[in-house]
Each structure stands twice: as structure tokens, then as C-alpha cells.
Amino acid sequence: MKEAIINAVIQKLETELGRQSQANVQSNATTAYSASNADKQRDTTGFEAAFLAHGYAVHCMDLSHRLDELRSMPIEDFTGQEIDIGALVEVEMGGDVDWYLLLHCGGGTEVEVDRTKVTVITPESPLGAALMGNIEAGFVELPSGAEGIILSVC
């Protein structure tokens, strides 16, 4: 099941990369047009578009690099081990049971595989940081004070 989840995450991130790449192309086109067709001496539309295009380009490069890492990441079984990148974790918090996949990228991405909704979290998130190094049946406490129990790790 974990392989199917990771593949679904990769597919969603590839779609996002395509959107970001298209936005980068559009920003570059706006930059070229605005710079050569400025209305006034202080027209900064071209500069703003260039700044935006640069941001999209950096984001695309980072996402592309992270996708390459994700595609080559070995799928490990974390049963009985400390939680680390690549772990699929079931957590009960406040009466709700949720599944999380801990990855370096794609935080907040949600996928559904075999009628199970899984949310990607990163070690930089409060929940990701609380889970890192923890074990099955361990307790997690978030900075907000919310507490939960780790039901399973795979």
C-alpha cells in the first residue's frame, strides 16, 4: 500500500510542477513584454514580473530536485523502528484517526488509496517534528498542546 501512496504523491507533485512551470513561462513572457512596453519612466511591471518569474523558476528547480529524490527513495518498512522519512504513520488525536506519510517534500498533499486518506507531512511541520524518532504506541504532543498516540508505523 505504501508504494501506491508514494506513487500517488509523486503524481500530484508532478502535476504541481507542471502548473509551476507554466506559471514560470507566463511570467517570463510578461517580463519581456512589460520591459519593452513600459508606459512611464517609473513603470515597474517588468521588474515585478521578473521577480515573480525568478521565484517560480527557483520553486520549479527545488520541486524537480525533490521529485527526483522521492522517485529514487527506497520503500522501507518502519515496523518496530523509529519513525523517519518514508514512514507511514497512523495517529489517533482527539478521537480522530488519521494516516500521515513523512517525506522531505509535498507537505500538505493529500492522496486517497484504497479508501484511505493519507496526508504528507514534513519534519519541519509541528506534527512531523513530534513524530520523528518516535515509535509505535508512543505519544505525541504538539506545541499547541494537542496530544495523540501512534497506533501503527509501517
Give the ranges of each region predicted by the language model.
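Non-DNA-binding regulatory cores of transcription-related proteins
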Residues: 80-143
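Alpha-helix boundary/interfacial micro-motifs
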Residues: 33, 76, 141-142, 147
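Long amphipathic N-terminal alpha/beta scaffold segment
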Residues: 54, 58-97
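Generic secondary-structure transition motif, activating predominantly at the C-termini of alpha-helices
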Residues: 13-17, 74, 135
